[in-house]
Every structure is written in structure tokens, then in C-alpha cells.
Amino acid sequence: CAVVDFGDYSVELRAYMEGVAYRFISNIEGDYKIVDELAEFSFSEDDKAWIPYVNFRPDATPDYATQFETSFENTYTHTALKDIDWRRLIFAPIVVERNDLKLWISESNLEDYPGMFLSNRDGDGVLDTEFAPRPKVVEQGGYNMLQGMVKSRHDYIAECHGSRSFPWRVVAIGEVDCELA
């Protein structure tokens, strides 16, 4: 475990034989907003992955903003990274097959922070992160009026109050699937 201090924030890093993880830690006092977070997972475009797309109507406008409200339920698609549908968001966890290794990408410790979606905007081997902006207006709706439906969003992803730690970004590494558990 290592912590790299940058003053107002630090990065905690962990590396083990079975994987790696990192998270940001804020030392800021008072209220502040997180505008965005950037992470990229780079692989060969020919590497294959098991990915769960967000449910998406093929006739809908290819807009990530409409895909942030999801049930996080879908079957996994096995595809080369270069063939990932750039119009669709992917939710974690995913498994990337690289050479003789399997890499499980996920997150943990989500509290008052949006979940991480992945995309392949450029049709290459880079998986980009996407985060839903914080809801501004939420109205009751959906099936049997049981859901909070986001009607508008802020231009930032999180509101924070004082020092805190942020979600872990995790990559587990194994040769066979059972080693990823």
C-alpha cells in the first residue's frame, strides 16, 4: 500500500499478486464539487472482453445521458474491444481477456458518488470512464410510480462536504475465471 500526497488530495494505491486498486482521498475542508473523473483502461483493440451493455433501444439517439438511468441488468456480450458499440455504455464489472490473463475491472466503496460506466468512444482498445452528472430535478415516475426519474442534471458529478475517500477502482488479475473471485 502506498499513499501519494498532493496537498489537498492524495492517491492511495494497492498492488497484490491478484490485482491492483487505487482511490482518491480528499483533504479539503468545507463544501466542494467534483466536476468529472477520468480513467482510461488501455488494451489492444483485438483483446476480447465480456461486457454488459446498458439496455438501449437501437432506434434511440446515441446519447450517453439517456443511458445513465438503468436497471444494471443485461446478459454479457463477448466481443473484441474494437467491436464494442461506441453508442452504448457498459456497466461494471467487465472481464478483459489479454494474452493468457483475465482482467476484472470494477469498483467498490460507492457512497454519495456516481457509479462508473465504461465506453469505447474511438473504437480502439481504450475503455474510457463515464459518470452520470448529479441529478438536479427528480420526479416520481416509472413503473407503478415507484422510481425517481431524473428530469435534469447538474454540470458536475458529485457534491462533497469535507475530507473523504472516493470509490476504489479495481483490476483483479487471474489466469482462469475462478481466480478473479
Task: State where each predicted segment sits.
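N-terminal accessory beta-strand-rich subdomains and adjacent acidic, glycine-rich linkers
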Residues: 1-181
